[in-house]
């Protein structure tokens, strides 16, 4: 997936912002990270997103996907080989990560995401 398409999809989610941080692009919903693109210049070197422990087991069984460094164990994965997840599947995982993070926000803030 191309960088511009990945950024556009993530930014299409409600109240999403992006900052350059930790050598990549960090996407946040109301200041809570839900997705990260790691970069070498303009080249994607991986993506990181949140998942449930059950999803973690399913995802890390695939080659090219492992525990995201510096993130909660069994809750965040890093995809190094984007070919492992086709574009629709990656978009679904990004959306799922957004939903998991948004679910932890206050009810008042959650109402602004609809």
Language model region names:
Residues 1-114:
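Charge-dense, helix-prone N-terminal extensions
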